[in-house]
Amino acid sequence: MPWAVGRRWAWITLFLTIVAVLIQAVWLWLGTQSFVFQREEIAQLARQYAGLDHELAFSRLIVELRRLHPGHVLPDEELQWVFVNAGGWMGAMCLLHASLSEYVLLFGTALGSHGHSGRYWAEISDTIISGTFHQWREGTTKSEVYYPGETVVHGPGEATAVEWGPNTWMVEYGRGVIPSTLAFALSDTIFSTQDFLTLFYTLRAYARGLRLELTTYLFGQDP
């Protein structure tokens, strides 16, 4: 009936309006945030260690980040490599810093993997330490290959196909609505692998990052 169709369109219009307002509110909120890290800062630090053994590179990077940003990088006893299954690919990550609007982590795969990048309310950049990163951008018919020392930027709302060769490791920085990225990052873990221990490890790492940021905000950091 005509009135039913009209009512349906009214609900659709209301839903789209709410989504638009929510998106605008989110970006206004991000515009008011003061960020701890900068994308180019992380990329430049990572480039210094590109080509080294990835474990050596990561250990040196962590030391430097703690020197530059005391109180914002998790202590050694809380660093943990955790599997990530998302978008059909499998890798591992070690979270160094996390807040509601930023994160810094180490990421990679020992075996190689490929799949969907995901779409995020965040900008994500990866600077490669070792291996290769293949990216096929939406709307194109050719892929691009990135090598150690190069940075791959994934903009908000973008989607790509990604492939990492064996022993590919990188430093990743994300800025945006970070909790929104967890839905994609945990989807395969919940609905496919059902590896709930990994789910616990991931949520615990993020909670530790939030706790550290709250502690530093409330009590400061000893020089």
UniProtKB/Swiss-Prot annotation:
It is a single-pass membrane protein. Residues 1-9 are lumenal. InterPro entries: ERG2_sigma1_rcpt-like. Residues 31-223 are cytoplasmic. The keyword RNA-binding does not apply. It comes from Rattus norvegicus (Rat). GO terms for cellular component: anchoring junction; cytoplasmic vesicle; endoplasmic reticulum; endoplasmic reticulum membrane; glutamatergic synapse; growth cone; lipid droplet; membrane. Residues 177-223 are annotated as: C-terminal hydrophobic region. GO terms for biological process: lipid transport; nervous system development; protein homotrimerization; regulation of neuron apoptotic process; regulation of postsynapse assembly. This is Sigma non-opioid intracellular receptor 1. Residues 99-106 are annotated as: Important for ligand-binding. Belongs to the ERG2 family. Expressed in ependymocytes and neurons throughout the CNS from the olfactory bulb to the spinal cord. Expressed by progenitor, mature and satellite oligodendrocytes and by Schwann cells (at protein level). Expressed in liver, intestine, kidney, brain, lung and heart. Expressed by retinal cells. Residues 2-8 are annotated as: Targeting to endoplasmic reticulum-associated lipid droplets.
